[in-house]
């Protein structure tokens, strides 16, 4: 990585996970953390300041090799900024899969996933089907899913059905405008998360 603005976290085997972190523009006792998980190109362009959120944008490769580092990073940032109980996760496409996975593992308040694949094919991932992580006894984030409107049988509907069977809150009623640029879509999602946080 040649981007001098990127920070990184490293494990005992010198595996590095690069990321950007932008603290909220205002100082307050209640500043949640939002983790933005998207593909590498979008992660590079999503470095913007948002008044009421701490923004963590990992630049990562998908797969098991970075899962533990990403969990460590989320925990570390949340502790440093005293927002362990106020974590929100957003991702689109493959980043939507990661958002659901990391939201579950970090016990986030809410996850927004835009057209996420739920069942991964041709992968060595131990979480090849995210519905296997659901159960009726553990606590889970509230899931806000936006699927493919042209394909009602997509993975989003499959995951939503599994959530409902396990008594987990899931909503399919909010989709940002897909024709907008990524930063605009993210701001739309953050405004939505603000409304969700104010209701809790």
Question: How does the language model describe each region?
Answer:
Residues 82-93:
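Alpha/beta-hydrolase fold nucleophile elbow
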Residues 91-101:
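Glycine-rich nucleophile elbow surrounding the catalytic serine of serine-hydrolase chemistry
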Residues 107-122:
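A conserved short beta-strand
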Residues 121-199:
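The feature captures the conserved acid-bearing segment of alpha/beta-hydrolase catalytic domains
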């Amino acid at each position: 990585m040649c981007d001098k603005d990127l920070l990184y976290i490293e494990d005992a085997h010198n595996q590095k996970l690069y990321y950007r972190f932008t603290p909220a523009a205002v100082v307050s006792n209640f500043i949640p953390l939002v983790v933005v998980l998207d593909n590498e190109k979008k992660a590079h362009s999503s470095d913007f300041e948002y008044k009421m959120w701490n923004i963590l944008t990992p630049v990562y490769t998908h797969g098991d090799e970075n899962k533990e580092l990403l969990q460590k990073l989320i925990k570390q940032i949340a502790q440093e900024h005293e927002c362990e109980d106020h974590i929100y996760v957003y991702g689109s496409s493959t980043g939507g899969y990661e958002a659901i996975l990391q939201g579950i593992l970090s016990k986030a308040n809410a996850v927004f996933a835009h057209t996420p694949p739920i069942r991964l094919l041709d992968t060595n991932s131990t979480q090849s089907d995210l519905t296997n992580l659901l159960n009726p006894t553990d606590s889970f984030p509230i899931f806000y899913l936006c699927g493919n409107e042209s394909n009602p049988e997509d993975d989003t509907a499959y995951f939503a059905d599994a959530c409902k069977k396990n008594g987990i809150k899931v909503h399919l009623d909010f989709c940002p405008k897909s024709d907008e640029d990524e930063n605009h879509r993210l701001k739309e999602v953050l405004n939505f998360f603000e409304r969700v946080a104010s209701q809790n």
